[in-house]
């Protein structure tokens, strides 16, 4: 996790410094959400408030900078200054957004909890266009920034993201009803 901006980069050199050049500046909102989810789970199990604090920052980055204002979906990548790098949206980051939001809601209360729950609802809304396909049970994987969903085969690797998001939402919300 970057000590300056609190975000997680995608590419590193062998000594864990950011990879040189443009590649070393890339941050994916989907991975900010995914690592927020991992850290809040680990932090809550271990009683590690620092991990939960870092999880909240990763989530904040994903939510504040990684959501396309027009389409309301998490995009593919940002630069380390949080400017847009690639506005393509894929299905899997929406699931990670949902997982992180509901897990963070589970370790917070009051207005903060309500904010994470509202964000989870936004993540569900972001999933909807990807699931609105002519063939029930399939999904669109990619939504370019400047055109409709790509009509291409649905990758099977996306299915576990969908199932895990459903499981996480159900598990967390069932305990906290």
Feature names for model-found ranges:
Residues 1-177:
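Glycan-recognition and catalytic cores of secretory/periplasmic carbohydrate-active enzymes
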